[in-house]
Amino acid sequence: MTTIVSVRRHGKVVMGGDGQVSLGNTVMKGNAKKVRRLYHGQVLAGFAGATADAFTLFERFEGQLEKHQGHLVRAAVELAKEWRTDRSLSRLEAMLAVANKDASLIITGNGDVVEPEHGLIAMGSGGGYAQAAASALLKKTDLSAREIVETALGIAGDICVFTNHNQTIEEQDLAE
C-alpha cells in the first residue's frame, strides 16, 4: 500500500505520498511517484492501492476532467459512476485523492466521492497514522500545509511497514 496526505491551509493545498511499492511482504521499489499533477497542472492527484489500477484511474479521471473543463467535483462524480458500473473498472483496487483550488476529494470504487472535513485527506496503509499527526498539527501549530504533509508522511513512514520516507510532494496556491 502507501500513504497519501493532503492539507489545505494558509492559501495552499499540498498533497504528498511516499514512494514504496510492495508485493506481498517484499519491497519492490522505493521511489515510485504516487502524487502528480493532472489537467494542465491545475489538479493534484494521488493514489493508494494497486499501481497498475491507479494508472488506469488517473487516465480515466483526466479524461473526465477534460470532458468537464476541469470541474473537479463533476469529474469525480462521473468517474465514481463509471468506476462503480463498468465491469472492468469495478475490479480495480485503488483509491484516488484529488484536489484543486476549490475542493479536496477522495474517490473510491464503491462510488463514493467524499470531501473530508477540515481540508485533510489521509489514506492508504499509513493513512490513520498520517491523519492523526496532521490533525494534531493543524489544531496545535501554525505550520504551513507543506510542513504538515511532510511531518505526517514522516510519522507514517516511521510506523507503517508499507510506507517509506521517499516523499513526493506537490503544492498549489488556492488563488490560481
Swiss-Prot record:
GO terms for cellular component: HslUV protease complex; proteasome core complex. CDD domains: protease_HslV. It is found in: Cytoplasm. Keywords: Allosteric enzyme, Cytoplasm, Hydrolase, Metal-binding, Protease, Sodium, Threonine protease. GO terms for molecular function: metal ion binding; threonine-type endopeptidase activity. It catalyses: ATP-dependent cleavage of peptide bonds with broad specificity. The keyword Hydrolase applies. Its EC number is 3.4.25.2. Na(+) binds at G157, C160, T163. InterPro entries: ATP-dep_Prtase_HsIV_su (IPR022281), Ntn_hydrolases_N (IPR029055), Proteasome_sua/b (IPR001353), Proteasome_suB-type (IPR023333). It holds the Pfam family Proteasome. GO terms for biological process: proteolysis involved in protein catabolic process. The active site is at T2. Allosterically activated by HslU binding. NCBIfam families: ATP_dep_HslV, PRK05456.1. Belongs to the peptidase T1B family. HslV subfamily. A double ring-shaped homohexamer of HslV is capped on each side by a ring-shaped HslU homohexamer. The assembly of the HslU/HslV complex is dependent on binding of ATP. Protease subunit of a proteasome-like degradation complex believed to be a general protein degrading machinery. This is ATP-dependent protease subunit HslV. It comes from Pseudomonas fluorescens (strain SBW25). The lineage of its organism: Bacteria, Pseudomonadati, Pseudomonadota, Gammaproteobacteria, Pseudomonadales.
